[in-house]
Amino acid sequence: MAHIGLMPQQAKHSKDYKVKGRSLEEQELIISDLNAVEKSGAFSVVIEAVTEKLANKLTKLSKIKTIGIGASKKCDGQILVTEDLLGFFSKNAKFVKKYADISSYISKAVKKFKSDVISRKFPSKKNIY
């Protein structure tokens, strides 16, 4: 599985986290990337944070399955980072839809743990060998 468009693993600064494919030059580069990953034998490709118009074009051009993340509902499939869709963070990219708010539960659990440690309630006898 390949990955084109926004590459969070390669972003060095927050300014690198922006939609790709707005300029003709970027579009041509991303189409070239698609061709390269197809030639290399990828069985599918994640298309991340590109314009909807470009994602639609990539899906039409592609010989392999396209998986969108912040791309287009016309991709062959969709993906979100688990931590994003579960609501681990208060700030998310525009394309993230939170399906839960786990962050509030995590915050409560950490505060309770801290309190139990400070008050010496944890570890108790049943938590020690």
Language-model segments: what does each one mean?
Residues 1-129:
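Alpha/beta enzyme core
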